[in-house]
Amino acid sequence: MGAVSRDDYIALCTELVEHDRCYYVLNQPTISDYSYDVKMRELQEIEVQHPEWKVSWSPTMYLGDRPSGQFPVVPHSSPMLSIANVYSLQELEEFFSRTEKLLGYSPGYSLELKIDGIAVAIRYEKRLFAQALSRGNGVKGEDITANVSTIRSLPMRLPQEAPEDLEVRGEVFLSYEAFEELNACQREQGKLEFANPRNAAGGTLKLLSSKEAAKRKLDLSVYGLITDQKKRSHFENLQLCSQWGFFVAGMPKQCRSRQEVVERIREIEEMRAALPMAIDGVVIKVDNIAHQDRLGLTSKHYRWAIAYKYAPERAETILEDIVVQVGKTGILTPVAELAPVFLSGSRVSRASLYNQDEIEKKDIRIGDSVYVEKGGEVIPKIVGINLAKRSLESEPWKMPSLCPVCHEPVVKEKVSVRCINPLCSGGMLEKICFFASKSALNIDHLGEKVVTKLFEVGLISSCSDIFALTEEDLKQVPGFKDRSIQNLLASIAGAKKVALDRLLTALSIPFVGSSGAIALADHFVTLDKVIEASLDELMSIEGIGPKVAASIVAFFSKHENREEIRRMQELGVQVLSKQSDKEAPLQGKVFVLTGTLQQMTRTQAEERIRSLGGKVSSSVSKSTYAVIAGSEAGGKLKKAQDLGLSIWNESELLRILDAKSVS
């Protein structure tokens, strides 16, 4: 690691915070586990060398997996920590040596599959399924009982030989077969496909409808047992779990020596491709429970366990073409078109090439036989070339000098190539898709396929055009039926009230992601103040460096960008300013939504409640301030009535939200 400045340190913290959010909250990883671990180790080294730089929000202070706010947070019975990773046999040997030194002798080990899923804790009371929690921050987790209860392999009642009260911990996952079925359904409905089974499992656990979750065929593999009746070994605990009706994947094995562990690691790696679910390694645990207790834990990891991570799965296929896409900020990105190949449980036909420099560095050419890997990335990447199969007639690939969409000259930047034509339809289409996406305004029923169709028929050519759409416009579009038209218009109407940080994210300001948008909203409070902010004001915000500040100033200095915002406001868009505690009339009040809302989506209702300081829970309790009952409200409404809670209809909620007062 070379010399670093405090700005470099802040930038690395900011980057890792965003990766954490994408991985743990959105379940949309942006880098591979290995790359993340390398960056995290670099951050830890910097903080050791410069402790005076350390900020309170550093990713090294947390385990990740922040609560989404959609589910109540509940304390764990005991810490639910992550397991440290190793990527080589040498690192594994260091774990063995460290463990044996602490114990004073060589213990036995148990070894099990490391399923690539979502960790959960499941409690049983009087042998009946009672509650399920996500890992959360390791101390508290979100209550995901409703969605976990849809898992068919999870026993709702335990046999008499099981303890009355116990907790199991396990991994929720989707089999390859269930994952393919789910993505087929997504395609049929015109929705985006999930990148991998883990993303799909994580997204399913965060669904607000357990009925929808039940359709997705989640599965659960148990890897731990907590009970007052402690057994001698972890392996015995897993055997008991299996006897009580839990699924325990992958034939856990007791190993008496280091060599047995290594042999088992190699055996599983050989059979990995034939497994019905995705795994990314194996977990090695000290088998004796008393030994585990002696070894204890750190603030983040168990000392008695380690995860040996396999290299990402790799396949060889033909690079048939390289196509260039124009992104939402005008950056040209080359994408490899591949002969379809099956990899990590899904069919792969495209791979990321990043930029011209990356292509030149690897000397990637059309027609090459290439090696493709799929880690946690949205699309796979090319990691090597089989030069023995390269044609003598192949030629190096060059980035076009003209934009492939608008055919205007492009500009070469330090790393990227950018189309600077503000009217380029390619960049604008990507910008509109992002504007409506879950990561930005989250407009239901306005996915990528719908945006593309509306763009192609000329109904929208800018983000503000979305808010000008009418029923008459949509009736002209082939395939649009009355119900889908009404659903889309209702979603658009609901999106007209938008939190400041959401809008700043949606505008696609170069170098400003969601964390930067939140920082801007927290500091400036109103959109007007952000627009008029000077370079010095922007650079005074922690995490906003010179490059980002200059980009923000440049963005808002352009007439077309200010005009776009003005038009949105003319079409009814209201930017909800960040509320201080004193200005938050719903501060500390807990709401529960049930049934179907007519004038806005549930997500939009939740965001508006939160913008005024309120909280949204998925379950009714005595601490609930009010239950918002839409049409077809179910059991939550009945429970609220039984508890004598306040029950509001949608109109009452809108009145409170619009008045910004509960009086």
Curated annotation (Swiss-Prot):
Enzyme Commission number(s): 6.5.1.2
One Pfam short name: HHH_5
Cofactor(s) listed: Mg(2+); Mn(2+)
InterPro entries: BRCT_dom, BRCT_dom_sf, DisA/LigA_HHH, DNA_ligase, DNA_ligase_AS, DNA_ligase_CS, DNAligase_adenylation, DNAligase_N
Residues reported to bind Zn(2+): C403, C406, C419, C424
Transmembrane keyword on record: no
UniProt record similarity statement: Belongs to the NAD-dependent DNA ligase family. LigA subfamily.
Catalytic activities: NAD(+) + (deoxyribonucleotide)n-3'-hydroxyl + 5'-phospho-(deoxyribonucleotide)m = (deoxyribonucleotide)n+m + AMP + beta-nicotinamide D-nucleotide
Residue sites binding NAD(+) per the record: D33, Y34, S35, Y36, D37, S82, I83, E112, R135, E171, K285, K309
Record function comment: DNA ligase that catalyzes the formation of phosphodiester linkages between 5'-phosphoryl and 3'-hydroxyl groups in double-stranded DNA using NAD as a coenzyme and as the energy source for the reaction. It is essential for DNA replication and repair of damaged DNA.
Annotated GO MF terms: DNA binding; DNA ligase (NAD+) activity; metal ion binding
Cross-referenced SMART domains: BRCT (SM00292), HhH1 (SM00278), LIGANc (SM00532)
GO-annotated biological processes: DNA repair; DNA replication
Main enzyme class: ligase
Positions of the BRCT domain: 581-663
Keyword terms of this UniProt record: DNA damage, DNA repair, DNA replication, Ligase, Magnesium, Manganese, Metal-binding, NAD, Zinc
Record-annotated active site: K114
Protein's organism: Chlamydia trachomatis serovar A (strain ATCC VR-571B / DSM 19440 / HAR-13)
Entry keyword annotation includes DNA repair: yes
Protein name: DNA ligase
